[in-house]
Amino acid sequence: MGKNITTSRKIFRYDNGELVQQEDQMATEFPLTVMVNGEEFVTLVCSPDSLEELVIGFLASEGVIRFKNEIKRFTIDESLGFAYVDLVSTKKLQLKDYTKRVIGSCCGKGRHFYFQQDVKTAKTAIDGVTITPENCLKLMRDMQKSSKLFHHTGGVHNAALCSTDKLIAVRSDIGRHNALDKLYGYCLLHQVPVRDKLIVFSGRISSEVLLKAAKIGVSAVISKSAPTELAIQMAEELNIMTIGFARNRSFNVYTHHERIQFS
């Protein structure tokens, strides 16, 4: 039986000049330790659902695997909080290459500040997906409506893999990076072609979020929040359209505005 993704607790709410006791729903935090070929690799603090997708997506994002068939055996013991991954390759992982984040310039045309493993795994988008303004806003609305966990707790981030007119998969997590890793794992497990897909996201587009999207292989990210300057620089270099502040009836296009399609 899986862990509960929410927990109930009695709280006191201040409203209209008085404290009133009521029951509230909170998002559950779950530490999951990932063992790779018998060695401890990482502990992810996450929402306890879609855990196989999370682990596989995280390992792909870190460059440990590229395809699901590189995993020989996968098991999760939720009672202990462990995921066990046996790879087809028995080559010993150099953990320092993955856990030590080294910031520096990438080889090539002076790319900006990639982490060591990101140089190997970030993909430059080949096909630039186009989308109408109406569908940009529709996808954001649809994602927000679909997240029951967010509506119950207000304590999670949402991410959706989409075509240009509909949601394909939506994942929620207390960690914004985890939500994206769950989508990556979903794509690998179900062998979803991603070159013509985009990601709709509830949080800020930081450089790490942008890199997660690049590793998945999509060519557009739509967020209801703001991007950072470094994320925009990376998006230009990786050929990814970035849209922020997608709310109500408006949004900002930060890179590749030519892909907004007017009828």
Swiss-Prot record:
Q: Name one GO molecular function term.
A: sulfur carrier activity
Key words, A-Z: Cytoplasm, Molybdenum cofactor biosynthesis
Indicate yes or no for the key word Nuclease.
no
Name any one Pfam family assigned in the record. Answer: FdhD-NarQ
Q: Which residues form the active site?
A: C107 (cysteine persulfide intermediate)
Q: Which domain of life is it from?
A: Bacteria
Which GO BP terms apply?
A: Mo-molybdopterin cofactor biosynthetic process
Q: Does the keyword Cell inner membrane apply?
A: no
GO terms under cellular component = cytoplasm
Location of this chain's protein in the cell: Cytoplasm
Q: Which family does it belong to?
A: Belongs to the FdhD family.
Query: Function of this protein?
Result: Required for formate dehydrogenase (FDH) activity. Acts as a sulfur carrier protein that transfers sulfur from IscS to the molybdenum cofactor prior to its insertion into FDH.
| This protein's name | Sulfur carrier protein FdhD
* Species the sequence originates in: Bacillus licheniformis (strain ATCC 14580 / DSM 13 / JCM 2505 / CCUG 7422 / NBRC 12200 / NCIMB 9375 / NCTC 10341 / NRRL NRS-1264 / Gibson 46)
